[in-house]
């Protein structure tokens, strides 16, 4: 995969990367893509998947939960414990 392709992926929004990844999956599932092209778009799909995972990790790190006191009043925020 060319370096400029990886650079292009790194500039994509989550929504655009998912949209393109879904398109690649559909093309591969259809089975009408020549082998060489299949390998190339599979590699692009892998880069898109990594981009989406990276953006999700960043979003998760920014999500916080509101902490409250015994009476239920907000007292601040803490990292969200996602499990």
UniProtKB/Swiss-Prot annotation:
Q: What class of enzyme is it?
A: hydrolase
Q: Which GO terms describe its biological process?
A: DNA catabolic process
Q: Which domain of life is it from?
A: Bacteria
Keywords per UniProt = Cytoplasm, Exonuclease, Hydrolase, Nuclease
What coarse category fits the chief subcellular location reported for this protein?
Answer: cytoplasm
The terms under GO molecular function for this entry are: exodeoxyribonuclease VII activity
**Cellular component terms (Gene Ontology):** cytosol; exodeoxyribonuclease VII complex
Reactions catalysed according to its record: Exonucleolytic cleavage in either 5'- to 3'- or 3'- to 5'-direction to yield nucleoside 5'-phosphates
Which subcellular locations apply to this protein? Cytoplasm
Please state the Enzyme Commission number of this protein. 3.1.11.6
> Could you give the subunit structure recorded for this chain?
Heterooligomer composed of large and small subunits.
Write out the function statement from the record.
Answer: Bidirectionally degrades single-stranded DNA into large acid-insoluble oligonucleotides, which are then degraded further into small acid-soluble oligonucleotides.
- Tell me which family the UniProt entry assigns to this protein: Belongs to the XseB family.
Record's NCBIfam families? PRK00977.1-3, PRK00977.1-4, xseB
The name under which this protein is listed is Exodeoxyribonuclease 7 small subunit
UniProt organism field? Bradyrhizobium sp. (strain BTAi1 / ATCC BAA-1182)
């Amino acid at each position: 995969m060319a370096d400029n392709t990886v650079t292009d992926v790194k500039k994509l929004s989550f929504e655009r990367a998912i949209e393109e990844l879904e398109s690649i999956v559909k093309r591969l599932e259809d089975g009408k893509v020549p082998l060489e092209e299949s390998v190339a778009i599979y590699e692009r799909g892998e880069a898109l998947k990594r981009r989406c995972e990276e953006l999700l990790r960043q979003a998760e790190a920014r999500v916080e939960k509101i902490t409250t006191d015994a009476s239920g009043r907000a007292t601040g925020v803490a990292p969200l414990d996602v499990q």
